[in-house]
Amino acid sequence: MIEVIILAIALSMDAFAVSIGLGATKQQSKVAPLGIIVALYFGLFQGIMPIIGYLGGKGVLSWAESYTPWIAFLLLFLIGVKMIFDSFSEGIEEDISKITHRVLLILAIATSIDAMAAGFSLTLLPVNPLIACLIIASVTFIFSWLGVLVGTKGGTWLENKAEFVGGITLIVMAIKIIITS
């Protein structure tokens, strides 16, 4: 279960980083409702996408069981490397000064693609995938809400650091899968 919590924290770093950026664009009086709305979008998508990855992984598992640790390693490692590279970018490139439901939907999908890929690794963990997805959704909800709050206080300089830490965490998990399999 500790692996699921670590995975949830690592996956939530994308959403946390984007939430900081969203929070930095809003005035103090609008932070509370924005924080809840952002957290709902990001938490929901981060919870749904691993199920999609898990189901895909189960289909692959039947014909490639001996390769699944390597596939999970490769996916987590590549996601981690991507997150580290993304942490050096300038942040959210599109104009989010008008945060609409459409913008939040696009951002929620974009930040949860890695959760879908990571869902594949749930086939290797001795956990109920639905409980794992609920944990991932809950952790992402909390981090997204906190991200909006932090964004209003700390600005955007924390965005990249959160994504970097998430990337390192996924790489460490990938290495652990190879070592223990």
Swiss-Prot record:
GO CC annotations, alphabetized: plasma membrane
Bilayer-crossing regions: 4-24, 32-52, 68-88, 103-123, 130-150, 161-181
Organism taxonomic ancestry: Bacteria, Pseudomonadati, Pseudomonadota, Gammaproteobacteria, Alteromonadales
A single GO molecular function term of this UniProt record: manganese ion transmembrane transporter activity
Name of the protein this chain belongs to: Putative manganese efflux pump MntP
Family as reported in the entry's similarity comment: Belongs to the MntP (TC 9.B.29) family.
Sorted UniProt keywords: Cell inner membrane, Cell membrane, Ion transport, Manganese, Membrane, Transmembrane, Transmembrane helix, Transport
Any Pfam family hit: Mntp
